[in-house]
């Protein structure tokens, strides 16, 4: 079992830029030890006959065919722009 000290908890909190009250250091120390104990148990499981995976459930992308549809003409869209220049939208300079 991995032993966590209160100084380890303080160091992790510092690295994560967290301010932990002193009265909670012991609580977090115990909780981290429990978590690492659980991870140790997982490390002991024999997984050599289990193929590596990236997720528990296989996900398949449901793709549809792309269909070209004409909804508006270019001119109709450009006529709705507050400012236009030829066949382009004119927008304020941002840089």
Curated annotation (Swiss-Prot):
* Biological process according to GO: glutaminyl-tRNAGln biosynthesis via transamidation; regulation of translational fidelity; translation
Q: Which GO terms describe its molecular function?
A: asparaginyl-tRNA synthase (glutamine-hydrolyzing) activity; ATP binding; glutaminyl-tRNA synthase (glutamine-hydrolyzing) activity
Q: Tell me which domain of life the UniProt entry assigns to the organism this sequence originates from.
A: Bacteria
InterPro entries noted in UniProt = Asp/Glu-ADT_sf_sub_c, GatC
The chemistry this enzyme catalyses reads: L-glutamyl-tRNA(Gln) + L-glutamine + ATP + H2O = L-glutaminyl-tRNA(Gln) + L-glutamate + ADP + phosphate + H(+); L-aspartyl-tRNA(Asn) + L-glutamine + ATP + H2O = L-asparaginyl-tRNA(Asn) + L-glutamate + ADP + phosphate + 2 H(+)
Tagged with keyword ATP-binding: yes
Keyword entries, A-Z? ATP-binding, Ligase, Nucleotide-binding, Protein biosynthesis
Quote the EC number: 6.3.5.-
Q: In which family does this protein belong, per the annotation? A: Belongs to the GatC family.
**Subunit (UniProt):** Heterotrimer of A, B and C subunits.
- Annotated function: Allows the formation of correctly charged Asn-tRNA(Asn) or Gln-tRNA(Gln) through the transamidation of misacylated Asp-tRNA(Asn) or Glu-tRNA(Gln) in organisms which lack either or both of asparaginyl-tRNA or glutaminyl-tRNA synthetases. The reaction takes place in the presence of glutamine and ATP through an activated phospho-Asp-tRNA(Asn) or phospho-Glu-tRNA(Gln).
Its name, as the record gives it, is Aspartyl/glutamyl-tRNA(Asn/Gln) amidotransferase subunit C
In the UniProt record, the gene name given for this protein reads gatC
């Amino acid at each position: 079992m991995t032993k966590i000290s209160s100084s380890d908890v303080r160091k992790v909190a510092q690295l994560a830029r967290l301010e932990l009250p002193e009265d909670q250091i012991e609580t977090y120390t115990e909780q981290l030890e429990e978590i690492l104990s659980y991870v140790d148990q997982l490390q002991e499981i024999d997984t050599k006959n289990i193929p590596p995976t990236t997720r528990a459930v296989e996900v398949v992308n449901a793709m549809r065919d792309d269909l070209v549809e004409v909804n508006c003409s270019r001119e109709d869209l450009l006529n709705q722009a507050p400012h236009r220049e030829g066949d382009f939208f004119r927008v304020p300079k941002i840089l």
